[in-house]
Amino acid sequence: MLTKPIQEEEKIYKNSSLGSYWITTFGCQMNKADSERMAGTLEKMGYSRAIDELKADLVLYNTCTIRDSAQQKVYSFLGKQVKRKHSTPKLKLVVAGCLAQQEGESLLRRVPELDLIMGPQHVNNLENLLERVDLGNQVVATEETFISEDITNPRRDSSICGWVNIIYGCNERCSYCVVPSVRGKEQSRYPDAIKSEIESLAHNNFKEVTLLGQNIDAYGRDLPGTTKEGRKENSLTDLLYFIHDVEGIKRIRFSTSHPKYFSKRLINACYELDKVCEHFHIPFQSGNNEILRLMARGYTIEKYKRIIENIRQLMPNASITADAIVAFPGETETQYRETLKLISDIGFDQVMTAAYSPRPNTPAAFWDNQIPEEVKKERLKEINELVETTSRKRNQRYLNNIESVLIEGLNPKNNAQMMGRTRTNRLTFVEISKNIEFNYSYGDEINVKITEARSFSLSGQIYK
């Protein structure tokens, strides 16, 4: 029997009087964490979680604007709710996140049926903003603000693995990226507040935490204090040591890293600290130094390769994942081929790929040397095929190995299988054998013998 723990949040928010809510989240892990926090606020206010988006009394879209396709998807979703609003005037429509920040009042002109538009920095102020809506106002909250600590318990989508934001915003100015203009300047949370949230997760039987930041290696640069060696007193490395002793937490992850700031000291900490998983997500974006310079990334391919070498020197079986952009303005066929070569040479476990998409208020969007759409599609197709092949080849190293898998639940497509992840973040499906006594709970770590390795997942059997 597979048992699931009950979270305290589920006990607290039983009585609801304000109707139901629905949240759809687009984009990154930061958005997912923000959505969990907003869901917690809504349930604290008295809303209950709807089971049908088209019957919810409050609909919130937490949006992404990193690519145009994500932006257009939001407008498509909004169209359905606008029709509902005309027949159900009491319906509250909220657009949060990066698109809300980017468009501001112009979004209200495009979709006048909206009740609330709020940028990412206002996530912790949702209750006050909705109170203004209840007074009959249409509210636009996109002004830059200090992100205060929120004492609301997030409504977690998982009962085992929790997202914990440790730094908001980004001070980098990559020429293609809209994030700094929509998420604002870097704001680090204090270590005590982060540890307190992780302790709360442990109290609620969570077993894994993922520390989040748009540029997580920048954590602590804006906090006071320096050591006698002259470095900042608070860094991601220091934070990992600080939270490592939280009882009940078995695994710690962090994302997303920037090669410009990824240090040997951090690598050493990951090697020394047992709970920190051997999984590193470090975007490289391009395999060509000239393109990296035009992107304003602040590092070279040679430096990136040294980082990977340093990781693998201490942790040979570590999982390395990355992001890559193809068809950046001016990218030649030769430069593009260097990106393919880098993927083959390093042997990534996985690479998240995208064709360049011009974003508002970014330098690269105004350059004349944009790549034709048909070339973008060809390059994206080719790189994706390479990534799939490379990932499948890389995953063969797990075959017949005994891997520790943290159980997250049942496979929604096959209830005869559990699913979980290895320390290296490989999604793993585990057969529930009828011939073996089975008595595990969500959050248990079990030994699994890997019997099948695909490009992006593994399968195996319980090993006793």
UniProtKB/Swiss-Prot annotation:
The lineage of its organism: Bacteria, Bacillati, Cyanobacteriota, Cyanophyceae, Synechococcales. Residues 396-464 form the TRAM domain. Binds 2 [4Fe-4S] clusters. One cluster is coordinated with 3 cysteines and an exchangeable S-adenosyl-L-methionine. Monomer. Residues 156-393 form the Radical SAM core domain. [4Fe-4S] cluster 2 binds at residues 170, 174, 177. This is tRNA-2-methylthio-N(6)-dimethylallyladenosine synthase. It is found in: Cytoplasm. Residues 19-135 form the MTTase N-terminal domain. Belongs to the methylthiotransferase family. MiaB subfamily. Catalyzes the methylthiolation of N6-(dimethylallyl)adenosine (i(6)A), leading to the formation of 2-methylthio-N6-(dimethylallyl)adenosine (ms(2)i(6)A) at position 37 in tRNAs that read codons beginning with uridine. It comes from Prochlorococcus marinus subsp. pastoris (strain CCMP1986 / NIES-2087 / MED4). NCBIfam families: miaB-methiolase, MiaB/RimO family radical SAM methylthiotransferase. The gene is miaB. Coiled coil: none annotated. Its EC number is 2.8.4.3. Keywords: 4Fe-4S, Cytoplasm, Iron, Iron-sulfur, Metal-binding, S-adenosyl-L-methionine, Transferase, tRNA processing. InterPro entries: Elp3/MiaA/NifB-like_rSAM, Methylthiotransferase, Methylthiotransferase_CS, Methylthiotransferase_N, Methylthiotransferase_N_sf, MiaB_methiolase, rSAM, rSAM_horseshoe. Signal peptide: none annotated.
